[in-house]
Amino acid sequence: MKLTPREKDKLLIFTAALLAERRRARGLKLNYPEAVAFITAALMEAARDGRTVAEVMHYGTTLLTRDDVMDGVPEMIPDIQVEATFPDGTKLVTVHHPIP
């Protein structure tokens, strides 16, 4: 299987997000990399599902709460940026304060 660097990045994000999802389901609080991967993967999937950029940006603020992550993690993530593939092309999505 030959993958481009971008495809490898997407697989790495997906793998980290899957691990984060499983840990969250077990009741564990997510650390910084897990929280970023969880949110990033959800944003990429929402874009693929056909949501608008504005919808994806709003959705990014609803995924995790302070109760879902370790202390200090929300302050470590002032924003998340991801190039997501929408039906009409790839666009940069920025979510400010993803963990309110």
From Swiss-Prot:
Signal peptide: none annotated. One of its GO terms (biological process) is urea catabolic process. It catalyses: urea + 2 H2O + H(+) = hydrogencarbonate + 2 NH4(+). Pfam families: Urease_gamma. Its main location: cytoplasm. It comes from the Bacteria. Keywords: Cytoplasm, Hydrolase. Heterotrimer of UreA (gamma), UreB (beta) and UreC (alpha) subunits. Three heterotrimers associate to form the active enzyme. This is Urease subunit gamma. It comes from Burkholderia cenocepacia (strain ATCC BAA-245 / DSM 16553 / LMG 16656 / NCTC 13227 / J2315 / CF5610).
